[in-house]
């Protein structure tokens, strides 16, 4: 039986709405991975269980505190850069304090078992790698690196953090602990007293090595991800609303090639109508269940699998056949984030 047939069969045997954990509710996902050679596209929803918020909740409504910095703002305004680095400096300790969750460990276990052809992540937190995953393409870059916009040299964020602390010994945020956003910065009003540092090699402007809103994803990276999807037997989307074209285009490409797409997300996504099957469920417990179903160990150092600790239990899970989205949110021109 082909992967397309197997996924379709599992999907058709599921009710559209189930409450509480249903073993068959993740059968379609387990079946997809059982065939192997599956590409994974992950989004912010995979990291929420690690304490890093996503841009949109289950309702699909944006819930970021403040507007994200655009590339044009960052490069065109000294004040904008000062504001960004002050906020990001505070948010950085939150990012470095985050640990991989059951979802990340499940993905690493599936990859280690040879069932994953590659991982494309829209996240910039590095948690896939921290969980032990190896074949990871960071579509939007990484907060753990910094790039100079003049000489293009790259350095670690840890090094920059030390320089920022040295340059701002008396700088503190007033008030309560600020809310952290998905891109690692925080909501902070007063930033005028913050000192920004430049490249140690040439004195140029430093930027986190991530793709800002309004900035292009590097073409070689885009094409490498297209090649991965085209050469895989299936595409599984984990925790992405697919609101922006940078992720949606891979679902569209897989669909156009007849490659089955399974989407696991809490809430609807922009790609649901193209999916072979969709599953509305928490990522951690779902991937834990899949790993157990396939007889694998997760990527913890002791190889154990703790369902109770990772919240495996009650919840609401919805698996549905492909459906049309009544409202599609169009973002970007197809080439941008």
What do the PLM-derived regions correspond to, one by one?
Residues 1-337:
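Conserved catalytic core of sirtuin-type NAD+-dependent deacylases
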């Amino acid at each position: 039986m082909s992967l397309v047939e197997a996924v379709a069969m599992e999907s058709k045997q599921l009710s559209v709405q189930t409450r509480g954990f249903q073993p068959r509710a993740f059968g379609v996902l387990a079946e997809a991975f059982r065939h192997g050679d599956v590409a994974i596209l992950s989004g912010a929803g995979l990291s929420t269980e690690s304490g890093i918020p996503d841009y949109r909740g289950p309702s699909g409504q944006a819930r970021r505190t403040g507007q994200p910095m655009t590339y044009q703002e960052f490069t065109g305004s000294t004040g904008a850069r000062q504001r960004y680095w002050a906020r990001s400096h505070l948010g950085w300790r939150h990012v470095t304090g985050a640990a991989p969750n059951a979802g990340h460990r499940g993905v690493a276990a599936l990859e280690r078992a040879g069932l994953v052809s590659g991982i494309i992540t829209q996240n910039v937190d590095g948690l896939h790698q921290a969980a032990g995953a190896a074949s990871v393409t960071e579509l939007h870059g990484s907060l753990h690196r910094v790039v100079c916009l003049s000489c293009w040299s790259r350095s670690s964020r840890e090094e920059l953090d030390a320089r920022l602390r040295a340059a701002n010994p008396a700088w503190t945020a007033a008030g309560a602990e600020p809310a952290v956003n998905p891109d690692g910065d925080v909501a902070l009003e007063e930033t005028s007293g913050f000192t920004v540092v430049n490249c140690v090699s040439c004195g140029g402007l430093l930027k986190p090595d991530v793709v800002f809103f309004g900035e292009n994803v590097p073409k070689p990276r885009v094409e490498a991800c297209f090649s991965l999807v085209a050469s895989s037997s299936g595409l599984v989307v984990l925790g992405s609303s697919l609101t922006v074209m940078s992720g949606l285009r891979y679902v569209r490409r897989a669909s156009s090639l007849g490659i089955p797409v399974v989407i696991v997300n809490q809430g609807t996504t922009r790609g649901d109508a193209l999916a072979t099957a969709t599953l509305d469920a928490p990522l951690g417990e779902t991937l834990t269940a899949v790993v157990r179903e396939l007889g694998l160990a997760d990527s913890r150092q002791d190889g154990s699998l703790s369902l109770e600790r990772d919240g495996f239990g009650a919840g609401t899970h919805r698996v549905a056949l492909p459906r049309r989205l009544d409202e599609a949110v169009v973002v970007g021109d197809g080439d941008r984030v």
